[in-house]
Regions:
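N-terminal nucleophile
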Residues: 1-139
Length: 139
């Protein structure tokens, strides 16, 4: 395993404000001075009034594609829904460059999407009615 300890969160409050946060221990045996995607706004984390995203994965590819921001930009400017935007980036664009990982994403309507292209990704969600989703693997 090359990844160690990424934690991310996205939230939508009662007033409709979206927020995202990402923290990570980074890659094992990373090169001294390497900066991954987690602290880079747009690559590992992004939130605006349409969408919030926290990402984990091979940072160089997430930086190159500006993954978190691009998901929200596709929702805002291309008219993609959250599922289409996040699935395209995570399942097609990142792997096409050789990277892997996943995201947790939330839109202003409360839709949640958590795609990943690895064997598993720890993830959970809860909605306003208290419905919970907790998972590691696809099913």
């Amino acid at each position: 395993s090359n990844y160690f300890g990424t934690v991310g969160a996205v939230a939508l409050d009662q007033k409709g404000h979206l927020a995202a946060a990402t923290s990570t221990g980074g890659m094992v045996n990373k090169r001294y001075g390497r900066v991954g995607d987690a602290p880079i706004i747009g690559a590992g984390t992004w939130a605006d009034e349409q969408c919030a995203v926290s990402a984990t994965g091979w940072g160089e590819y997430y930086i190159r594609l500006n993954v978190a921001h691009d998901i929200c930009a596709r929702v805002r400017y291309a008219g993609d829904d959250l599922a289409q935007a996040s699935d395209t980036l995570v399942m097609q664009d990142v792997p096409a460059l050789g990277g892997n990982g996943g995201v947790i994403a939330l839109d202003a309507r409360g839709n949640v999407r958590m795609p990943f292209n690895t064997s598993g990704m720890y993830r959970a969600a809860i909605d306003a009615e208290g419905k919970r989703v907790v998972a590691i693997y696809r099913d």
